Amino acid sequence: MKNQKIKNFLLWFLSDIMFLFSSASALSVRWARQNYPMQSFRNVYFVLSSDTSGHDSGTFFSALKGFLIPSLVIYIVYRIVLFILKKKNINLSAYIFAKLNALYMIAVVLLSVILLKAWNYPLFARKVNGKPVSSEFYKENYTDPFEVKIIAPQIKRNLILIFMESMESSYATVKDGGVFLEDIIPNLSRTAKENVNFSADSLIGGGHNLEGTSWTGAGLISKLTGVPYFNPFITENGNVYCLRRALSLGDVLKSQGYNLVFSMGSEKQFENRDAFLEGHGFDVHDIVWYKEHGFISKYYRVFWGFEDLKLYEAAKTELTELAKSSSPFCYGMLTVDTHFPYGYKCPLCKDDFSHPMMNVLRCADSQVNEFINWCKAQSWFSNTTIAIMGDHCYLNAPENNFIDECSPLSKKQINERRRFFNLIINPSSKINIDMQKNRDFSSFDMFPTVLECLGNQIEGGRLALGQSLLSKNPTLIEKYGEKKVNKEIMKRSVEYEQLR
């Protein structure tokens, strides 16, 4: 009798664990598909395999609300129902319930695997960690920047690099090259028309979101070095390094005597961004740095760290100081308010649209426009070039895609127009900007393009996998097509490994 009670207790305990686990798992899959780009398994794999400390502070509360608390509520209701049935003397078999909950758990696990296409992760991990092979693609198309003659201009121009989180050219109107009836980013659209904007046609446009370039860490690496993110980090003696044998925009400008600063409102170690940026010439100012130097309160934290409103104010102060030096400067910025899935609504944001992300984008457009106007009013602006780029396209979740929901175009038409935003303001007068339209390009091409916009002369116009868009020479996408390039850059190659 005693043994039977112990057995029943253990069966009920196991049954409850399986029920709670299954409910939480089912709801967590739904939550993940509403908040993360689970269809982009390569992105998810690479981000999770890097340093994820410093993540969005709202993720935990979102998880609480999205599946932890609801699953607990479901479990409590489940136990109440069992209690009522027991009070009514309805026989409840622990063994039968354990079997039912085991079937429930198996069904949830199988459904989760199917919905998340989870088999892709071990397959891709095997590919990433497999034996590297020699790549004919790299041999034919990679131009070693260390062997390219780069002639700096006699008078070096300052550079302000603004990487805007998830900024796309598709946020413009349909008639201007975007996908919406109303322009979400009217200021950036107007400024793009008035300045240099590289595009696949005569309208406002941008670059292809290739594999290995389509999330923040990958966007920064690919735009600054001309190579993709394919497990670029290596750890030696406890230190993390990133593409030590690749030349970056920061390395080139550092060698030309520039002062380099890169600012962000989040923590620099997320995705090992510090290893990349600091390893290639930049002094990184992140939320920790700004707290230590009194820019923000020690205990202040919202969203990923602090909002863009404060970042732009800090940038104005830092640019004013950098401009006092006799050396040219390169000041990089990474905004964050427009991060998926819904962005961060600061005090400046208005409710112009039904979707919160669209309101945050409109607010970001207004803030960067005010910052551009401030720069134009400074004494140093005449010798300063501003390059604005989306770090990547918006990472929509399978069950949360405001672009598809709010655009009048078909899904196919939308996908054809989705490109990361690019804008060059006040480039060197010595360059030829006639080639800015009817170009198919990617993040790789921004490295040599930005350098030439500063007045540098690049022999052949090629650096790494990038081709300057100021040249008539074809980019990789123009030469091979997007599908072929994606296939080749997602192979583990000996040539890429040699850059680590």
Give the role of each language-model region.
Residues 37-40, 133-134, 138, 248, ...:
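A diffuse structural propensity rather than consistent per-protein peaks
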Residues 129-146:
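Short extracytoplasmic/periplasmic juxtamembrane "stem" segments immediately C-terminal to an N-terminal membrane anchor
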Residues 144-500:
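Solvent-exposed soluble domains appended to multi-pass membrane proteins
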Residues 38, 42, 101, 118-121, ...:
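Generic intrinsically disordered, low-complexity segments enriched for polar/acidic and small residues
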Residues 44-45, 124, 134, 138, ...:
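Generic structural signal of hydrophobic/aromatic residues within well-ordered alpha-helices
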Residues 1-130:
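Transmembrane and membrane-interface helices of multi-pass
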